[in-house]
Amino acid sequence: LKVAARLLALTMNMHALRFLPVLAATIITPAFIHAEIAVKSGEKIAFLGDSITAGGWGNPAGYVRLVSAGLEANGVHAEPIPAGISGHKSDQMLARLDKDVLSKKPQWMTLSCGVNDVWHGPRGVPLDEAMAKSGTYDEKVASRGTYKKNITAIIDQATAAGVKPVMLTATVIQENLASKENGLLAPYNAFLRQLAKEKNIPMADLYAMFEKRIKAENKPTVKVLTSDGVHMNGEGNKLMAIGVLKAFGLNEAELDKAKASWPALEVAAVEFAKKQAEARAKAAAEKAKGTPAPKKK
């Protein structure tokens, strides 16, 4: 009888063991381990940046619009605060931080900065003091500070004001990844990654995402993500938006919902581009009809 009881117990235990993988899968499934979307309905998100960010709002299918639509598709009704200005560098963003961002009292701020700091060459912003003394920059370089100090100040001031920053690495300067400009940009992005880690700031490593996509496409003569090597085309805007949404905590299923909301914006973007082209053609025609201004004696 005792032997029979032991055999029965062993059989039951072995039967239970068969269900352990199912139980484990249930416990560690992504639905259980995935954190909630960090942004909540009613919160404001400031998008601080340069022309890439300005276009990200001005274009109906720009990355700022796509991020907003993607959150909406997942039930998060956040208010975007566009704060991108064409040509701006880190010193200019720092100078207008209070007016364009902090005064609006957002809960979040994405920071996209670095392309112009490098791309503007002698008029750019050096990474650090050593670079400032390299002889590369014009006589006004001291007034622009350094990228490291400017970015750190932006993050610290935002945090002190209760704003949660999200760091975006600067996107490519030319889709030729071996370009001189991309080489110069590399230490700037390395600094951003380091600072985000030190301050425990969410990050969208957009440069790494762009690099991976450009290499995968392997089309040296085709602009894959940009219209001119710097500013985004439709695919570039979508990739930027995906990076930002991931930084906000969206999982793959939530990203799929976000992407499903984008085609309507892309249709609007086509119409927007058409109207812009018509306006440019009209302006050019009017200019051609006009008489040149008289030369000064």
Regions found by a protein language model. Give the residues of each.
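Bacterial N-terminal signal peptides that target proteins for export
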Residues: L1-P21
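Alpha-helical cap/lid subdomain in secreted, periplasmic
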Residues: M14, V39-S41, A61, R65-H77, ...
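Bacterial N-terminal signal peptides
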Residues: R18-A31
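Boundary at the C-terminal end of the N-terminal hydrophobic targeting segment
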Residues: I33-A35
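Catalytic nucleophile-elbow at a beta strand-turn-alpha helix junction centered on a G-D-S/GDSL motif
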Residues: E43-G58, K89, V118
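A structural signal for the hydrophobic beta-strands that form the central parallel beta-sheet
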Residues: F47-L48, P82, M167, T226
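Short, histidine-centered active-site or binding-site loop motifs used for metal coordination
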Residues: G49-I52, G84, T171-V172
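Short beta->alpha junction loops
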Residues: P82-K89
